[in-house]
Amino acid sequence: MTFKALLLAALVAAPATAQTIRPDQAAFRELYKELVETNTTLSSGSCTAAAAKMGARLKAAGFSDADISYYATSEKPKEGGLVAVLHGNDHNAKPMLLLAHLDVVEAKREDWTRDPFTLVEEGGYFYARGTADDKAQAAIWTDALIRFKQSGYKPARSIKLALTCGEETTFAFNGAQWLAQNRPDLISAEFALNEGGGGMLDASGRPVLLAMQVGEKDVQNYWLEVTNPGGHSSRPVPENAIYRLSAAVTKVGNHEFPVTFTPTTRAF
């Protein structure tokens, strides 16, 4: 088994197929289902619980206690995660890091046609909170390491897996940041593979494209304040501050920003 198989797995796990699945695919489906159906929202879920479930599967596959490191803080006990390592043969080669986040965006049952925390296969697709962002990738990475371990495969460089929390919410405990600041030894690597890319399948389910993200969007926030001479609301003036502000916002909404090529996009 080569690292190409790991990347191909990321492509194959997109739309669900109705055909009979192999035993190894069924094992992945079971892992994926368990992870998706574990509530990891900030309000009522637990990334720590999800990490423990994935850790238990890794250990059952043959990973030792020393190969799996759990982390959480006393202030945020439910927002923990894990780092696991599959040791390679070349001790001079720096590891690769597989990164995925376990937390998901809030999901209110009344807003969903289906239960957001029950994995449903329908019309060739999986439905539930986190099926794509980012539990598909977390499940793929975990399953890949399990398969490698069970087959006895040892890569040249070690492979590290980091399952973290806090990606979806700005003010939440950020597991990836905490690891970088407090346990850089756990995630030290030559390079990392994270979410942001994507794949494409043809009509028969064959992978035909693997896209890679090479940049991240950024934002700019502006505070707009409009004033006008005071007066009583019973006698509104034509130059009302609210009208002027709404007109400005409308202009921004109607503006089409030009397409800009950066050195990165030009290279591709």
Q: Across the structure, where does each feature detected by a protein language model lie?
A:
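Short Gly/Pro-enriched turn/cap motifs at secondary-structure boundaries
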Residues: 72-75, 168, 212-217
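Acidic/His- and Gly-rich active-site-bordering loop/insert found
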Residues: 19-131, 138, 148-157
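Sec-dependent signal peptide recognition
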Residues: 1-9
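N-terminal signal peptide c-region/cleavage motif recognized by signal peptidases
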Residues: 13-15
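Acidic-enriched catalytic cores of C-N bond-cleaving enzymes acting on peptides and small amides
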Residues: 184-191, 198-206, 213-221, 233-268
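Short, solvent-exposed loop/turn segments at the edges of secondary structure
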Residues: 4, 77-79, 93, 114, ...
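Acidic/histidine-rich catalytic neighborhood of metal-dependent amide-processing enzymes
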Residues: 125-126, 130-211
